[in-house]
Design a protein with these regions (language model features):
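P-loop/Walker A phosphate-binding loop and immediately adjacent motor/lid segment at beta-alpha junctions
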Residues: 24-26, 30, 85, 101-107
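Short, charged/polar surface micro-motifs in flexible loops or helix N-caps
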Residues: 72-77, 119-120, 131-134
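Short amphipathic alpha-helices in soluble, non-transmembrane regions
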Residues: 79-87
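Catalytic cores of NTP-dependent nucleotidyl/adenyl transfer enzymes across multiple folds
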Residues: 124-188
Length: 188
């Protein structure tokens, strides 16, 4: 019978997926520590919150680290000062800024690309928000709710879907969570 072989292969694949997730999450924390990003933003008086896949333990292959950073008042000069300090790190290869202060989002979007010791690029998204604005705490609450309902089966399913998604597809983390939790999706 092929069943024992199939079960063995399936269990190894599942362990591999969990190992990939664990390794990438460890690498993400190395990036955070090497850049000193939290201290940099706190140095301008901002509150720094990790959001996204890393905050929920669901970071897989997409090397992306997300922060929501809150200031009141939000002075664009302070935002640039923090990013100027971050840019001094030689592993930061590129930085982009989108000024959305005069929109309903009331934020400055920063995207930085960090090259790790294996020459892999990590995208660091830093959304600098006006404390008390429309999206203050929104994604932190999404992560909290996700962690409240996430079982080991849901976690493995989300990680598997993220692992199996082709690199050419761009699916937001929240779309995976909704598909699995609300839609019952179990495979790619």
């Amino acid at each position: 019978s092929l069943l024992p072989t199939f079960v063995l292969i399936f269990e190894k694949r599942e362990m591999d997926i969990l190992e990939v997730a664990k390794r990438n999450q460890q690498r993400a924390w190395e990036v955070i520590m090497d850049t000193d990003i939290i201290r940099i933003w706190e140095g301008i008086g901002a509150e720094v919150n990790l959001v996204g896949s890393l905050s929920t333990g669901l970071l897989m292959r997409h090397r992306d680290i997300d922060f929501h950073i809150y200031s009141f008042p939000l002075e664009i000069s302070d935002s640039f000062r923090a990013m100027s300090e971050l840019a001094e790190n030689p592993s930061i290869k590129k930085i982009e800024c989108v000024n959305l202060l005069h929109t309903v989002e009331a934020c400055v979007e920063w995207h930085a690309w960090y090259q790790d010791r294996e020459n892999k690029l990590w995208q660091i998204d830093m959304i600098h928000l006006l404390k008390g604005s429309r999206y203050d705490g929104y994604f932190e609450q999404v992560a909290k709710r996700l962690l409240e309902v996430m079982t080991e089966e849901i976690r493995r399913t989300i990680l598997t879907l993220k692992y199996e998604t082709p690199d050419t597809e761009h699916i937001m983390g929240v779309e995976y969570y909704q598909a699995v939790i609300q839609g019952g999706v179990r495979n790619y």
